[in-house]
From Swiss-Prot:
The lineage of its organism: Bacteria, Pseudomonadati, Pseudomonadota, Alphaproteobacteria, Rhodobacterales. It is an enzyme of class 2 (transferase). Pathway: Metabolic intermediate biosynthesis; 1-deoxy-D-xylulose 5-phosphate biosynthesis; 1-deoxy-D-xylulose 5-phosphate from D-glyceraldehyde 3-phosphate and pyruvate: step 1/1. This is 1-deoxy-D-xylulose-5-phosphate synthase. Its cofactor is Mg(2+); thiamine diphosphate. Catalyzes the acyloin condensation reaction between C atoms 2 and 3 of pyruvate and glyceraldehyde 3-phosphate to yield 1-deoxy-D-xylulose-5-phosphate (DXP). Keywords: Isoprene biosynthesis, Magnesium, Metal-binding, Thiamine biosynthesis, Thiamine pyrophosphate, Transferase. It catalyses: D-glyceraldehyde 3-phosphate + pyruvate + H(+) = 1-deoxy-D-xylulose 5-phosphate + CO2. Pfam families: DXP_synthase_N (PF13292), Transket_pyr (PF02779), Transketolase_C (PF02780). NCBIfam families: dxs, PRK05444.2-2.
Amino acid sequence: MSATPSRTPHLDRVTGPADLKAMSIADLTALASEVRREIVEVVSQTGGHLGSSLGVVELTVALHAVFNSPGDKLIWDVGHQCYPHKILTGRRSRMLTLRQAGGISGFPKRSESPHDAFGAGHSSTSISAALGFAVGRELGQPVGDTIAIIGDGSITAGMAYEALNHAGHLKSRMFVILNDNDMSIAPPVGALQHYLNTIARQAPFAALKAAAEGIEMHLPGPVRDGARRARQMVTAMPGGATLFEELGFDYIGPVDGHDMAELVETLRVTRARASGPVLIHVCTTKGKGYAPAEGAEDKLHGVSKFDIETGKQKKSIPNAPNYTAVFGERLTEEAARDQAIVAVTAAMPTGTGLDIMQKRFPRRVFDVGIAEQHAVTFAAGMAAAGLKPFLALYSSFVQRGYDQLVHDVALQNLPVRLMIDRAGLVGQDGATHAGAFDVSMLANLPNFTVMAAADEAELCHMVVTAAAHDSGPIALRYPRGEGRGVEMPERGEVLEIGKGRVMTEGTEVAILSFGAHLAQALKAAEMLEAEGVSTTVADARFCRPLDTDLIDRLIEGHAALITLEQGAMGGFGAMVLHYLARTGQLEKGRAIRTMTLPDCYIDHGSPEEMYAWAGLTANDIRDTALAAARPSKSVRIVHSA
């Protein structure tokens, strides 16, 4: 009996990028189809970023066929689109561990493979990194060509333009691939561009634009208009030069990002002839080749496990509303009551829940694109004008606007409402998206009020509190995922600033929790009570200002005080310690422990796995409290790896 033929005969021959060098265009095209099928099969079982990776399959194959990774440095912006790159660089056998604990990352990661030249996760960093590699080569380091692959969304960020400007000034040989997946090129335009690129291969780069303009003059009206539209995004300078040419780049394109022959030939010729910085404008279709993705509004950008035939995602039935939706709904309700409320997001209206308000009040919700620096100061300006701006950002992206928070918001004491989504550990996106540092950054800023929601009902109260707070900037952090299933108020209440609440009363150990780990504190208290340790659990609610009356009471009435938070060192626990040191209460003989995230970056896994590794489970809290209150009692403290 003969063996069943492989469904991936071309991919089976690939152990690394070198295996692509001898393949024909037909073989490379077939390889791309097999890679695309493999990505769909893998992500259907693991979840992940599907649409972006499907859109760059041909481009990735062509890049590895032309360039020589890892000597040549392929630098993927954001990294959502790196799955075909990982498959072709020796990690195919591990793809089913994608984003799982102990498995491969969903982003490029230097420690994972020499083919991952530069780590990613946040946007608009690739051109800067590629230029750094190029300068390293010029100064004698063993670096080949450097290639930044950046999307049409990421290139709108200020950092990308700063890098383009510097690269054009230095004239270093490097390549920027603009992956434009928001433009459709009709077949005649594709044919035109094939002809224009033929001219480019026969003449200096500078002749390309003039040739394009000359040809366009003689095309039929609809085709001529299509050709001009294809260049419209980048052609806006006096004299018809592209923005990139004005910045010092040679510009090639648009190129059909799904035509293997055109891609390979363009890359080969450009690589052979370039002496300075070159931008190649490649047009792709996000979700290409998988009908459910191409038909979805978001092109199945980020997905959970799904059915391959239908594309339907296999999501578990939630036990409680998720925090993001609660925020979006309650903010929309407040906006209906107060016309001064506006909202700002940096390219994440759905991810932050602002799409709910956007549907009802479209003129009062502003998506500024990938521009957190601008978003912060834009919100500050609106606050200065008398509006009530709610700026919703993921915790890990708050970092990108920190100087503006210091200089434009806190220093001027402007009432910007900073809504910090994805606070704490977020799971499969791993270290690049962990919300670990926002409290450490904000709690030390004069004028700022910093809150954290312990559950979804508290989130309701805190949204209302933020809306009513006009005396300065206020931040509210809350985690990813569903809430605890608590009873929800019809409308939130305005909380007293700087006042916490006591959840359970005890006499021996006090656990002072800040944020959504309150549930773990309450579980730990039950364990401690079962062992005869009388335990108080309090919800601080505020990190700045601290509830000093509550802290005094906990110190006076207990042998041990444990602070608990879902953030890095230097946050809530540090603020409590500073207060105790300042008031001389560290000399009272109490055992004091701070429980924070460890001093390291935590790799991807489920949130439960990550918090276990971090030593922040209910068992860890119980062990820490027991060791502090009764040091003579033998306690085994286990941090799960």
